[in-house]
Curated annotation (Swiss-Prot):
This is Protein RecA. GO terms for biological process: DNA recombination; DNA repair; SOS response. SUPFAM superfamilies: P-loop containing nucleoside triphosphate hydrolases, RecA protein, C-terminal domain. It comes from the Bacteria. InterPro entries: AAA+_ATPase, DNA_recomb/repair_RecA, DNA_recomb/repair_RecA_CS, P-loop_NTPase, RecA-like_C, RecA-like_N, RecA_ATP-bd, RecA_C_sf. GO terms for molecular function: ATP binding; ATP hydrolysis activity; ATP-dependent DNA damage sensor activity; damaged DNA binding; single-stranded DNA binding. NCBIfam families: tigrfam_recA (TIGR02012). CDD domains: RecA. The keyword Cytoplasm applies. It is found in: Cytoplasm. Transmembrane segments: none annotated.
Amino acid sequence: MNLPDRKKALEAAVAYIEKQFGAGSIMSLGRHSATHEISTIKTGALSLDLALGIHGVPKGRVIEIFGPESSGKTTLATHIVANAQKMGGVAAYIDAEHALDPSYASLIGVNIDDLMISQPDCGEDALSIAELLARSGAVDVIVIDSVAALVPKSELEGDIGDVHVGLQARMMSQALRKLTATLSRSQTCAVFINQIREKIGVSFGNPETTTGGRALKFYSSIRLDIRRIGSIKGSDNSDIGNRIKVKVAKNKLAPPFRIAEFDILFNEGISSAGCILDLAVEYNIIEKKGSWFNYQEKKLGQGREFVREELKRNRKLFEEIEKRIYDVIAANKTPSVHANETPQEVPAQTVEA
């Protein structure tokens, strides 16, 4: 078959497919504009946005945030919700754990009056609600907190102690098969928070695994492994926050295995001033000599905690340094990358103030 005949045969096949399955069921990838631009939602931590390679979490995709207890999973997801709202979007929170604190969410920046929340009775209801919200096309981000709390209906109806093998894994697999296509069409970002468990009898390798089976690992475009690596001390030597390390364990949209570190403060959430300070030092915008920090040959102060508070107070200085960081990023076109091993939970260490 020569080239003109092949083109005619292809055009006839495409016409028949569109007639059979509807317009847009098959198209040229290059002409499909949605493939060229990926809409994202910022995470609240600039260092993590850079590690993701696309300056945020993508819309229309499944995201998994997993880690041990008190590692900042819910805080990170809540910041994504707050940033989606700041962009004019609508957010929904499926609180399967029944543990969302409205006052803390409001402190982070969430407009709780506009936040849609659901506290379903069982896992099937939670995932059905998520699918219906995504299908509406009116929701920008849906947070499911958490996968471990999505209890199958048959398990709820049984007695404590009954053995239910693979129920949750089958439920997640069935739901994600339906949900992923809906999310892509509606450009809704689904953020699944997950817990970790220990595999029994593992002598070599990492014994940690996540709940809900393998389906979520496969369907996730991005998986974030979040760990607490130290505590942050205030001027009176009391704990005021945690130092957090996030490894991009999977990334379908940029190179994976990048690592980002940032501060989560108890009364603030993710510290944007701390992120700016760390990146400014990394890009030599702020010079660090011992415990002193200098900017344009002027002393900003002594101690990381003092300088972070100074950047938080002085909004003009904060924005000036932030602009210079973005200029460096644009010039280099390479995000901050730290190749490292999988972050493991380590004994708490003190971050020097």
